[in-house]
Every structure is written in structure tokens, then in C-alpha cells.
Design a protein with these regions (language model features):
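Small/aliphatic-rich secondary-structure junction motif
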Residues: 1-45, 124, 132
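A short acidic, amphipathic alpha-helical/loop segment
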Residues: 15-17, 87-91, 116-117
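Residue-level detector of structured alpha->beta connecting loops
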Residues: 25, 71, 96, 125-126
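Short, hinge-like loop/turn segments at secondary-structure boundaries
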Residues: 45-49, 93-95, 118-120
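Structural beta-alpha unit
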Residues: 68-100
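Glycine-rich, Arg-bearing micro-motifs that act as flexible, cationic patches
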Residues: 99-123
Length: 133
């Protein structure tokens, strides 16, 4: 599983996750966890699911496209939550991932948020963990 928190992926994380999925012959889950509060008026008007910015959309789509071209089964997830870090941990547990690659581009994510996520991942996730450092 390759995951980010609403920012583009780190290229090293993509390479590691993709290489591992190809080598192991396992499905690759590409997941983006975003902090979005569902607003009642937005939901009524049909605007609750705004698309990702183009750069982020390309960053999320590229690993999936590459994996698919290499014959790897791919699942793409976009999870919106008030609390994206706990949501990410819940999805990792539900999917029973053997390898979890947390790969947001460090230059695009707030330092405190990244540290919080890494601390939660290391204390909760039972799979092998790769973190972009």
C-alpha cells in the first residue's frame, strides 16, 4: 500500500512501492487521505466531491498507471475524513497490507503533520513500514 496525505508522492516512495509490488506479484493500493469536512449545503448541491488539484491528481495517477503497465493489479482509494491519519491507519488494518509505504513529498507536507503521522504509523501498523525520510 502506497499512501499520502493530500500531497503529491515522493518519487522514492513510488519507486519502492512499485518495485515491491512487481517483485512480490502483489496488488498495489494507491491511497490519498484528505482532510475534508462534508458541508451540508455542498452535499445538497452536489459539490461534496471536488476533484484533486491537477498536480496531485497526476501524482496519484502515475504510480497506478505504471503498476498497471507492469502487470500489477491496482486499487486506487481516495478517503475524505475529518481525521485523515486515523482513517489511514484504519484502512491499512482493513486491507491487511503486507507492506505500507507512507510516501508524501516531504517538501509539500507540514512538518508537524508528517511527524504525527509517522509516530501513529510506527505505533499502530503491524505491516512492514517504509517511510520517506
Amino acid at each position: 500500500m502506497l499512501a499520502t496525505l493530500g500531497v503529491p508522492f515522493d518519487p522514492e516512495a513510488v519507486a519502492f512501492a512499485l518495485g515491491s509490488a512487481v517483485e512480490l506479484g502483489q496488488r498495489l493500493i494507491v491511497a490519498n487521505f484528505v482532510e475534508r469536512a462534508p458541508l451540508p449545503l455542498s452535499a445538497m448541491l452536489g459539490y461534496e466531491d471536488l476533484p484533486d488539484p491537477p498536480e496531485l491528481a497526476r501524482s496519484i495517477a502515475e504510480p497506478a498507471r505504471l503498476a498497471h503497465s507492469l502487470g500489477v493489479s491496482v486499487t486506487r482509494l481516495r478517503v475524505k475524513s475529518f481525521h485523515p491519519i486515523p482513517a489511514m491507519l484504519e484502512v491499512v488494518a482493513e486491507q491487511d497490507a503486507g507492506l505500507f509505504v507512507f510516501g508524501p513529498d516531504r517538501s509539500r507536507i507540514m512538518r508537524l503533520r508528517y511527524r504525527r503521522a509517522v509516530r501513529a504509523i510506527r505505533s499502530t501498523v503491524t505491516a512492514l513500514v517504509w517511510v520517506a525520510d
